[in-house]
Amino acid sequence: MKKIALPIIVIVAILAIVFSLKKLMSTSSDNIFYEPFKGTVHGTAPFSQISDSMWLPAIDRGIKLANDEIEAITSQFEEPDFENTIVALDEVGADLDRVLNVFYPLLSANSNDAMMDIAVEASQKLSDYTTAITLNEDLWHRVRSVYNDRESLDLNPEEQMLLQTTYDSFALSGANLEGEDREKYRKLSSELSALTTAFGQNVLKEMNTYEIYLTADDLAGLPESSVTAAAEAAEAKGRKGEYLFTLDQPVYSAFIKYSSRPDLREKMYRLYNGRNTSGEYSNIDNIKRISELRLEIAKLLGSDNYATHSLKRTMAQNPEAVYDLLGRLRDAYRPALNAELAELTEFATKLEGKPVTIKPWDYSYYSNKLKAEKYAFDEEALRPYFPLDKVVDGVFGLATRLYGLTFTPNDSIEVYHPDVKAYDVNDADGRFIGVLYTDFFPRSSKRPGAWMTNFKEQYITEDGVNSRPHVTIVMNFTKPTAEKPSLLTPYEVETFLHEFGHSLHGLLADTKYASLSGTNVYRDFVELPSQFNENYLTEREFLDSFARHYQTGEAIPEELVERLVRSQQYGAAYSCMRQLNFGYLDMAWHTITEPVSDPVDFESKAIETVRIFDDVDGTMISPQFSHIFSGGYAAGYYSYKWAEVLDADAFAFFKEKGIFNREAAYSFRNNILSRGGTENPAELYRRFRGQDPTVDALLKRDGITPTATVAQLNKD
């Protein structure tokens, strides 16, 4: 054979191509999001292998593959049917979900500047991607065709709900729009996505800018745990001998409740409630534009306002039903609030020996002292009985007694931060239920608050395998110190119970389709499992299972439990009216019919009928109201009170049957926790409870004499 001599330039070109291919292959194989996670326990995320350089390539690739899957659906020759269109569409985007289900939980719990920048870029890409799907005319025609034939398809309830949800997601997202309106919707959605992301990032960034250094003379009234933590925080910053306070929720709450320095309480209050109202991280322009964009989108889709548009897929169904509930609660609780404030003013005046006008930064301080005097109750007296490790045992044990679940630490599962722990969750018969991650302590990379989310949702694979969920609960409890473990207040135990209730909703999911699994339910139903769990806080039988003094091992004394129970109704009217402030403000922003020019004046008028204190210059709710401006609760904050009615009614049923009654527990599990969004929640609730919910149990629990009742909450 004759040898062929290749020109050197060709050889170089070939080598360059080979090198490029190898580099491409290496890059692909090095990005762990390009394939299902392999070689890890239960297929959990290999956090140690993740680098920030992986996020955008994986997101881009996921979007491309998802678009290819959409193309495969729309280009097929077969007539549209449930399997080749609705089910196929539900399965689109597995590769994209794999990266997003890790990215967004970490963005909230363990973020950095690079991830925040990536989130901004990704939000635009994802907004464009989702909008392109809902405005895909060929896809919409197929979905609509199947929906129009729904009566002849012989679908089971879960399949019917998947079809209805799919159809609604298109219809409520502009699929019926034509021509210029479609392009306008696309642009509005893209801008809205960018602004909601920016809003959330501003909240986190501004929170991290505050460092308040105090001296020993400034610490009067503060509990030892707060002082010790502040001293250690200052020392870590190289300022030994001083005391560092931030605006992290547990730090702020303790300061405003216990500091006997009204000037410092006022300073902290103004800082905390003045966040994002001005300066580099101001959200004033963001809230104006976000609300305007939502209004424009609603009008484009045929609704008078955003709330009318958004509430179509809820139990409430319309703004009138929301305002009806909020108004009934306002009228029922207002007389009690007036009485509470009058009593508190009288107490403060007596305590100080001079007339006192209660200011918003005074409420927690005097309220805590009155509570201690009236019920001989102080949350700090209970803190030693709630060391975090024992609370974990108690909360997990609650799920064991009710549902037969067990939680076993698994150190073989990778975690994303040293503070995080991972658990195997198994059923009573040993069957694997899922993975639970717990993340308890504040850090600069974590946003404030408490929440539950999924790294992976439950669903049934094409092969019939029940793919189990990976769930995480995230909180911001005070960290342990060198001398003491993390000791929780009753409120923090309640928060733990709340988020754990959400986690059970995810862990116990048993549905065919991921989009209907776990917490993928109507927004005003999603808080039922979490708020139901809170009821156990004051149950002696539950407390006896774990509450032990961290030093002596002594069980929590009966007298303290009785005080805790008696104190639960204390301040109930204030607590409700505070939530109604948020609910009315949310609805005001989302029932506007014209853009808002002055957010300060708008907010003041929105909460006029539920106002507790006079406005404080320089402070607002809206610029930090992440729930409605970046957290998915737009026109939905009322759902906390809606679900509170449900949870009080549900727990009243357990009180009748026994709080650990297995029959009642399994009915709650099988009809509420495991069913996700597979059926109308009103029907699921009736199946569990045997009747519709009423507001009576909530009013009774709070010690409120009803001025009106809600006969039925479900609006079929």
Model-based region annotation:
Residues I17-S28:
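Membrane-interface motif at the C-terminal end of an N-terminal transmembrane signal
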Residues G39-M54, V102-A122, S145-K187, T246-D285, ...:
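Short His/Asp/Glu-rich catalytic/ion-coordination signatures at enzyme active sites or charged loops
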Residues T478-L497:
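Short pre-active-site segment immediately N-terminal to the catalytic Zn-binding motif
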Residues M1-I4:
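Positively charged n-region of N-terminal signal peptides that target proteins for export
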Residues E158, L162, A194, Q201, ...:
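Active-site-proximal, well-structured secondary-structure segments within enzyme catalytic domains
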Residues S26-E224, A230, F654, K715-D716:
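N-terminal helix-rich structural modules
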Residues I9-V18:
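Hydrophobic membrane-insertion alpha-helices, especially the h-region
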Residues S26-Q49, G221, E242, K390, ...:
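C-terminal, non-catalytic "cap/extension" segments appended to globular domains
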